[in-house]
């Protein structure tokens, strides 16, 4: 059965069955994009300043993706409980110019560039009562492209990576390359999680790798990439903490609210 109820743009679309796209072009886990569309083609697009669990999050749902085009195809009927449908599909086009304001470049991605991305399909179970779809008391469930191990989409560090290529698949096989920068960011993310656990236990942060038991994970004993200064240097700040490593004459930095960036 294919059904949808919400018709107003920027309504809370996941209250219907929907399809969702999450994009973090620069991979810093902040100021990422979310787009949700239901079977009526109703759109909810927003910028989220940081993940909900990092506090002081703002969801800018007054923002619209410039030039966004969506098209829904229903293989069957919509909102007709009397028959059985095969499903629905959606095609989405987002102009680069609508997204690059949050990207490290003012141009579209180059060959080999990678973005953090995830997809989700929210589904509600229903019963048909008096010829109407009525949700059961069970919560919705999600099918996702890159599983995160938790029913919670707002963990950009756990999203998948999409690599851009100039060649189409019928021209040439393009090798996916897991970048050294992403390996470094992931290792710094482990420090972030250890700081959170330490704070919950001690109500303060630590500038000591030893106190954080950072090397309990044996994989963290080795630098995540060649030429990385290791382990990270931690500084306590008025707002919490920051940590960095040096790599290729740049600093890779992470801070208390999870933002990770290159300077």
Residue map of PLM features:
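Terminal low-complexity interaction tails
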Residues: 201, 230, 248-253
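General beta-strand recognition
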Residues: 20, 89, 242-244, 253
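Short, glycine/small-hydrophobic-rich surface segments
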Residues: 179, 190-224
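Secondary-structure transition/turn motif
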Residues: 93-96, 244-251
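Structural preference for beta-rich elements and adjacent junctions enriched in aromatics
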Residues: 1-192, 196, 226, 236
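Short, surface-exposed charged micro-motifs
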Residues: 34, 233, 251
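A short, surface-exposed beta-strand/turn
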Residues: 249-263
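Surface-exposed, charged secondary-structure patches
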Residues: 220-246
């Amino acid at each position: 059965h294919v059904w949808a109820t919400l018709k107003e743009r920027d309504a809370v679309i996941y209250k219907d069955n929907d399809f969702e796209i999450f994009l973090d072009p620069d991979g810093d886990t902040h100021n990422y994009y979310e787009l949700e569309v239901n079977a009526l083609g109703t759109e909810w697009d927003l910028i989220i300043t940081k993940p909900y669990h990092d506090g002081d999050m703002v969801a800018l749902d007054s923002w619209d993706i410039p030039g966004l085009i969506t098209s829904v195809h229903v293989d069957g009927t919509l909102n007709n409980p009397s028959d059985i449908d095969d499903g629905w599909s959606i095609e989405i086009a987002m102009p680069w110019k609508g997204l690059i304001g949050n990207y490290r470049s003012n141009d579209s991605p180059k060959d080999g560039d990678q973005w953090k991305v995830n997809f989700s399909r929210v589904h509600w179970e229903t019963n048909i009562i008096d010829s109407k779809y009525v949700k059961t008391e069970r919560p919705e469930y999600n099918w996702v492209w890159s599983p995160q191990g938790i029913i919670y989409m707002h963990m950009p560090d756990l999203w998948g990576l999409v690599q851009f290529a100039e060649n189409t698949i019928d021209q040439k096989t393009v090798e996916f390359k897991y970048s050294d920068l992403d390996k470094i960011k992931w290792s710094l993310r482990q420090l972030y999680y250890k700081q959170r656990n330490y704070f919950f236990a001690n109500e303060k942060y630590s500038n000591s790798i030893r106190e954080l038991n950072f090397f309990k994970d044996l994989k963290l004993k080795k630098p995540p990439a060649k030429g990385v200064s290791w382990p990270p240097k931690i500084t306590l700040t008025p707002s919490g903490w920051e940590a960095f490593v040096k790599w290729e004459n740049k600093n890779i930095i992470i801070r208390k609210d999870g933002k990770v960036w290159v300077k």
